[in-house]
Amino acid sequence: MSEWEQLVDEILRSLWEDDPVFATACGIHDYDNKLASLAPDTVEQHISVLKRFAAQLEQFNGNLSKDQDADRRALLAWVRGQIINWEAIQWHKKEPALYLDHCLYGAYLLVARDFAPLPQRMECLANRLREFRRVLDEAKVNLQPTQVPQVYVETAAETLEGAKAFLQSVVPQAVEQLSDESLRRDVLRAVDEAGVALTDFEAWFREKIVPEAKGNFAIGTDLFVQLLRDEHLISEAPDELEAMGREVLERTKVELAEVANAIDPDSPWFELVERLKDYHPPRERIVETYAEEVAKARQFIVDKNIVTVPEGERLRVVETPAFERATTPYAAYMPPAPFDENSEGLFYVTPIDPKEPEEVQRDRLRGHCIYALPITVIHEAYPGHHLQLTVAARSPSKVRKVFGNNLFVEGWALYCEELMWEQGYTSDLRVRLFQLKDLVWRAVRVIVDVGLHCKGMSFNEAVNWLVNEAHLEYSNAVAEVRRYTASPTQPLSYLTGKMAILKLRQECQRREGSNFSLQRFHDRLLACGGLPIRLVEEMLQ
């Protein structure tokens, strides 16, 4: 093993030990019975370990190939991003949901991913559930009530409700399948312990955090720029990104109006979208309709030589597990863990629940509109996330297996929506209408991301942008903005990444002239895993 591979292994092992849930998500199962320690001294220790790794990565001077040096810089960018999050932004002092999410995701992965026999996973689950109390006690020490923004209070209150539902319905559903009576009792006892820990935390939260919460969610221009520069390797200033978002927004609105006019000259685009949502598959064929579209999209990219689909790659379209349905109203993608034996991706589709009120069922059906459905499949499955992440998981580079930069990962999926239209996957203008509607929303995300964190944009102003420009339902817009306030630079990653990929493609076309092959371009792109887009540009030089 080379010196470089040893360093990567050392860094990964340390990250997995520090964050057992991250390990489980990667398909490393040595720590499945633990949750991370978030005690103040452990956090300090974690920061100094990250700084040591950053220094080692900066100063590494072994013989590296071009690929390995790109990996070194990508890993360094990720580590620097973590240092900014822990040391400068200090989410652990102001975001209560951070602790709840860690506990829940740690438990959820053991239920959702079928990487080992159920009894083995349930034993680990019982241990993780017993650790809820420790993690939530650490939250009480770390959280500074006056630093917590009001919006994070709302997010945490909602997450607490979700946590109770998870313990009351999800875990018991999994436990029912156990034949070992004593293990079943053991897990249910752990569920009770976790429930009490959550109730205690909620009481503390309502007494100590809620009355005092008056923090500012904006991280400010300096830290925003630092994230762009150090984690994403982007040199553009927030103002330049915002200007790009505004330009794409205006351009897309013009095209939307043209497309809407061609379909029906008497309706503005947003009214047309609402009307077209009435066209959906019959409720009993929703899952089959997605499965057919997935097969069709996969066949299209093979037939048209758009990108190489790796041998043995699999994606299964299944009903969303019961425990996921509350948070997945329509569809979602569950990627395979990079180090798990099973490399099958799962495409979840949530069936319509006949027990829900008629009005809710009608809304859910409208969410599966036949003109929006192909775009969801392209984005999540082929040639979007599933294909990109499957290729990354098979990379010989551990860095590319594990670390995906948002700009590349989300940029690729959004680029695929445009790519499939331009390649003639469909010529139906109604599908194009839905695609452009989503592009408007992605452009607004850039404006709002910069606005919230750098320009003093208020929560309500951001909601209004989404409602007035992207025509999101009010409740969806609120949920979106809540997420944006706690994930600076994430919302802008979709469009920024897509534009960078398009620009890179144009450069390669110009350079290679008649020798340019779209398939080769995409294959080289995906071979980079999820490297920051700037490094991908260098790799393709």
Where is each model-derived feature located?
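N-terminal maturation segment of proteins
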Residues: 1-541
